[in-house]
Amino acid sequence: MTPSEKFLQKIGLKDAISEPNAENNSIKENNRRSFLKKSALGGISLGGAFLFTPIEEIIAQSTQKVKRFSGPSDLQITDMRYCIIQNVGRTPIIRIDTNQGIYGLGEVRDGADERYALMLKSRILGQNPCNVEMLFKTIKQFGGPARQGGGVSGVEMALWDLCGKAYNVPCWQLLGGRYRDKVRMYADTPEAPTLDEFKLKIKHRLEVQGMTWLKMDISIGEVKDIPGALNNSKFWGKNLAQWNGGYMDYANTEHPFTGIQINDKGLDAMANIISEVRSVVGYEIPLSSDHYGHFDLNNAIRFGRKVEPYRLAWLEDMVPWQFPEQFKMISDAIETPVLTGEDIYLLSGFKPLIDIHAVDIIHPDLATAGGLLETKRIGDYAEEHGVAMAMHFAGTPVSFMASVHCAAATQNFLALEHHSLDSEWWDTLVKTTDGRKLFEKGFANVPLTAPGLGIELVDEECKKHLLPTDKSYFAPTPDWNDKRSHDRPWS
């Protein structure tokens, strides 16, 4: 055997010509132990023993401090389990387990059904979680807009968390590296019973919580009781609830089809609310707006023109995202930036808006859009077309941190929403693996070295906030193990 062959055999890249006997094995093992013992005491001198040390002992010494978190090539998905946190109604968290003891965390969109994720379990069992893109392409056909995208997106989050843990790198590193060490947040600020109370809440956001970007809700619901403010509003009932109701109720009737119009008196009243908030915020702090109510294109343009003196950072979801031509008409008619996107699934859903520059800013929610990589692709595509990206978020710290990693890795990013700043327990659901806070004074901390998403659940805290109708906590889900369909979407 040549010296080269002996070397390859010793490092395991060439099979031995003959089986070694037990005596030789014993001698080698004693030599190895003796070597490691000596190395631990004093190390190997390059000028001395190193030149005469067997190659296997050199390899053992040089690699004894290498971190082996798993064998990524041999990883297999063995289970998917869930719990449901009572946050913004209900927010399911999923856990994908493997044959090597490491697991990944993901989140099904706030307000969504855990079964959007569980139905995907049979399609990923036995697969290597590090093949993220292949698995994503396998399951993405089962997603859809809004909460329907939560299952695919939650699984994708968990796969990246697993992959980062397997290779001992943060998720942002797997996405191509980071542009920033801190991620700017914007504070969602819901309506208050009175304008004075709302102004106090805004002041608290700035002076106590240290936020540097705010968002306010301003809707026709705030002026509905002013005589002559609205036209045709009483047809829909007294409260104009935007989220709850039957299929034919106001909440589920798209903006162009309600027949509601805002009279000048109503526009004046809504503009006055924004003016009062600006008097507290000033003009240096970006102030965005949302949740105007369901009224048509023409009234959206009238409202947009009315509030232009207050230089809002954006007008959000003026009409449903499915109408890109209407968004284009609004953005062409006013100077304030126009934004949408929290309910759009996949890059293909954003392209009709981006391609015609119907909006100035896109606004994906990573838990709907398709997960980390797809959301980065959306941001990159928008950047190529001169469109910025903000990010919607209203879930638990799991999806929050997934969004932080994506935001860190996407250049045209502006700000990430935080929807639970007033919760006393939201950030107790997890602990960071690098020991830092999730966020401080308006900025989220990007995990610089922590593998995966950089968080672990705090079980005792999560159990305090489980959905009352489902107190299970990562219980087995064997009913979802078997695949029962032929999934190919083409013939």
Where are these regions (language model features)?
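Shared catalytic-loop signature of beta/alpha-barrel
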Residues: 122, 127-131, 305, 311-314, ...
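Metal- or metallocofactor-binding catalytic centers and their adjacent structured scaffolds
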Residues: 99-172, 486-490
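Structured beta-strand/loop patches that form or line metal/cofactor-binding pockets in enzymes
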Residues: 63-105, 422-431, 491
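Extended hydrophobic packing segments that form well-structured cores
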Residues: 453-491
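Metal-dependent enolase-superfamily TIM-barrel catalytic cores that perform enediolate-based chemistry
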Residues: 182-328
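N-terminal twin-arginine translocation
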Residues: 28-37, 45-67
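Ligand-binding pocket scaffold of soluble enzyme catalytic domains
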Residues: 105, 166, 184, 200, ...
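N-terminal secretory signal peptides
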Residues: 1-31
